[in-house]
Amino acid sequence: MSWQAYVDDHLMCDIEGHEGHRLTAAAIVGHDGSVWAQSATFPQFKPEEMNGIMTDFNEPGHLAPTGLHLGGTKYMVIQGEAGAVIRGKKGSGGITIKKTGQALVFGIYEEPVAPGQCNMVVERLGDYLLEQGL
């Protein structure tokens, strides 16, 4: 399966039990900041934004004072899982980022999608990739 198929079929799909509800944008990005696959709506990010995200995975709490920035959008960092998941909130939407051995899985959402639904979609794929050694 191509990386694009993972984004299209496992991240940008309808959320279980909520037909028509789906993430706003999603991507799989290597630890080095190279995009493996992304939805057409995923924001163009700056290298320093990706560096900040990677630093927060290695040093949990790094982004808390400044917020998480992606594509020029600032998210308030909320509870995640140190070294494994970063979650952010902005207005009625937010972001979930799951770290795997080689990549970061991104999901961005807006209402009516709930934070927990985004977490479920992103973390399920991230856990699967971890199980595959990726």
UniProtKB/Swiss-Prot annotation:
This protein's UniProt keywords: Actin-binding, Allergen, Cytoplasm, Cytoskeleton, Disulfide bond, Phosphoprotein
Superkingdom assignment: Eukaryota
Matches recorded under SMART domains: PROF (SM00392)
Cited InterPro entries: PFN, PFN_euk, PFN_sf, Profilin_CS
Post-translational modification, as annotated: Phosphorylated by MAP kinases.
GO CC annotation: cell cortex; cytoskeleton
Keyword GTP-binding: no
Ranges in coiled-coil conformation: none
Residue ranges of the motif Involved in PIP2 interaction: 84-100
Gene3D superfamilies, sorted: Dynein light chain 2a, cytoplasmic
Disulfide partners: 13-118
Family: Belongs to the profilin family.
Quaternary data: Occurs in many kinds of cells as a complex with monomeric actin in a 1:1 ratio.
Function: Binds to actin and affects the structure of the cytoskeleton. At high concentrations, profilin prevents the polymerization of actin, whereas it enhances it at low concentrations.
Misc note: The variability of the residues taking part of IgE-binding epitopes might be responsible of the difference in cross-reactivity among olive pollen cultivars, and between distantly related pollen species, leading to a variable range of allergy reactions among atopic patients.
Stored PANTHER family: PROFILIN, PROFILIN-5
Stated name of the protein: Profilin-3
Origin organism lineage: Eukaryota, Viridiplantae, Streptophyta, Embryophyta, Tracheophyta
